[in-house]
Amino acid sequence: MSSSSDAIKAALEKGRAAGLSATGGKNADYIPFLASVPSDLFGLAVVTADGQTFKTGDADIAFAIESISKVFTLALVMEEIGPDSVREKVGADPTGLPFNSVIALELHNGKSLSPLVNAGAIATASLVPGDTADARWNNILECQCGFAGRRLKLSNEVNQSEQTTNFHNRAIAWLLYSAGTCYSDPMEAVDIYTRQCSTLVTATDLATMGATLAAGGVNPISGKRMVSAGNVAPILVEMTMEGLYTALGDWAYTVGLPGKSGVGGGIMAVVPGELAIAAFSPPLDPAGNSVKAMAAVAAVADSLGHNLYTTRGKVSS
């Protein structure tokens, strides 16, 4: 169902109201940089599959992409080795556990289950093409820039803040490596993964990146193909299964769209063939998802009738 400009503008107002009225949560405090971001920031954006952009609030304030980056590194690797190889090497199942848990690794002989949790994302980073760590990182950055339709940059402040506190991810990488499921030097994989989480984006960027998936892999602003049409569906499936971690059930009920969150406060949701919704607000719930952003995206999706599990209109009996 295609949404008119007026409908999207009205939905944004409803989303803004829902986001601003949502309370609770706190900034991620285990990464020093994230703890220092003003908690009252809130932005919301929609970009359609034909390139129309709508936004409100702090939609052009930059923040750390964090785990939302996993989607785009997955796209890069899927283009390189194909979805079947990704499933074999990284996995394609929900864990039902926190995003940084090692329990799933122990239960599955050191193999990750999903490219959208930390273990699988580190394994995915180890599969990025390139002869050196810098070459692999540059490939990731160029991929992110292509999805956003503009030049993005690494925040040295975010990267340093994370590199000095990522001991848990280093342990995960060594567990993967010991099981033969980290496909490069494990510390190089963690370094690349940490860098990919440290680029700066806006809610408008995230909506554009999501709209690229909604448009079958072609950026609707630049016209550049970023991922083959056949690889879009597997990416959206991964987002559906693991994009919001242990809050996935609530998300499926209230939003009903493929989505991905990050502890920087961003959330991106994709309506295949139509548009993408993105929101940003730093305070997080216990699962690591932005309280205000979740409420805002849910309100926009509901207003536009874009919950994929809801039947609209008359149904024949």
Curated annotation (Swiss-Prot):
EC number, as in UniProt: 3.5.1.2
Keywords annotated in UniProt: Hydrolase
Binding site for substrate: 67, 118, 162, 169, 193, 245, 263
Membership in a protein family: Belongs to the glutaminase family.
Annotated signal sequence range: none
Enzyme class of the recorded protein, top EC level: hydrolase
Name of the molecule in the record: Glutaminase
Keyword Lipid biosynthesis: no
GO molecular function, one term: glutaminase activity
Subunit structure: Homotetramer.
InterPro entries named in the record: Beta-lactam/transpept-like, Glutaminase
Top-level taxonomic group: Bacteria
GO biological process: glutamate biosynthetic process; glutamine catabolic process
Catalyses which reaction(s): L-glutamine + H2O = L-glutamate + NH4(+)
The keyword Protein biosynthesis is annotated on this UniProt entry: no
